[in-house]
Amino acid sequence: MKISDGFWMDKKGYDVRYVAQAYEVETTDHEIRVLATPYVVQNRGMTLAGPNLEITYSSRMENIIKVHIDHYRGGLDNKPKFELAEDEGYLPEIRKEKDSVVMISGQTRLEIALGDHWETAFYYGDRYLTGGADRATSIIKESNYIRDARLQSQWEDDFFHPAKDPRTTYLREQLKTGIGECIYGFGEKFTPFVKNGQTVEMWNNDGGTCTGQSYKNIPFYLSSQSYGVFVNSSDKVSFEVNSDTVSKVSFTVPGETLEYFVFGGKNLEAVLERYTALTGRPALPPAYTFGLWLSTSFTTSYDEKTIHHFINGMAERKIPLQVFHFDCFWMKEYEWCNFEWNKEMFPNPKAMLKRLHEKGLEVCVWINPYVAQRSRLFAEGKENGYFIKNKDGSVFQCDLWQPGMAVVDFTNPAAWKWFQGLLKTLFDMGVNNIKTDFGERI
């Protein structure tokens, strides 16, 4: 989210207030609490208004330092949250020095300047990682006319759009980068691997594989200087990687709270170990999933004879194959999803799956969370209330992707149990894996 108009000014319609001073600093056994003001307070009269930010620094795991920033605390805490494995029993070392207050977690250290200026610095041992100074931490107010124009543009799109968000307050942090430092990460991305110079938005979209949009956004970046930053928000986090200010990575979130973690390590592998220790690690999938998967691809015209031609061709070329994947057209066109094989192409799917298994293959099929009007499942879903509805109680439908398609309402327990039953039918038939496509823009 670019707010600046060059280095000296901000864009019209935005009021930006930067933290200028750690006015009050309190320490406990496990955290540092800072009352941060937007100017250096020189007399009592300057304490009559804000905005102030209350910043809490803590560490619940070795070599991980958490920064939590609040403006207003009276809002509703109703956003989805990431599950984190913090150790409530872990205590960092905290001490006050002449010109700073220091937190030490393992070999990772944070220093916060005291006095009439704002500065934070993160180190791993004696090695500087990153930090903030003047014009780093800020609160941003968006003018109503900017908000109204933003909302109007979203209302004009009746389905595939970001959430319509009327909030006009944003919190932003800007952390320094050094000469030659490279930034990586942010989840699945199709833009250049080195992210310097890019604007990176954390919002899952069905945007294909050749734009800045992506399907699996993760608000974590990794630096070539062996540190990482994770923004703990499932909201629409916007990163500017040396693209708004060329020597900083900035991240902005809508609302009154911003929380992020800094991970220190001796190398990139150690940083990733700390990140996954906090956020979790996936279970190890079956061994065959690491092998080669062969797909029908999207619009290929295929039947059982065609797929055996593909599979036999791999064997003739001595290319080992573990999984064969059927994309959308295993079902009849205009009927996705109906969870039924196209009988014109696959008259005996159970026998076909058995033959594929006899060749030592696992089988995967494609699905999505939509039900076309011509699907045999549409009437059942409508009658039982399994679909997302309009405000008037009618089924929401559109013609994007499949004509007249409805969207399964997975907030309805009866709907997802129904959907589970449809999946079980496939598994009982001999399908081993499911490609769960779409759903990003709902």
For every predicted segment, state its role:
Residues 31, 226, 289:
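A residue-level signal for beta-strand positions that form part of recognition/binding surfaces
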Residues 1-4, 15, 38-39, 47-49, ...:
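Catalytic and substrate-binding clefts that recognize carbohydrates or anionic sugar/phosphate headgroups
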Residues 74-75, 83, 246-247, 301, ...:
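Alpha-helix boundary/capping detector
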Residues 68, 78, 231, 240, ...:
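Generic domain-boundary/flexible-linker signal
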Residues 2-43, 47-99:
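A low-complexity, Ser/Thr/Gly/Pro-enriched, surface-exposed linker/loop concept
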Residues 283-442:
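Aromatic-lined carbohydrate-binding/catalytic grooves of carbohydrate-active enzymes
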Residues 65-66, 228, 427-429:
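Short amphipathic alpha-helical segments with coiled-coil-like heptad repeat character
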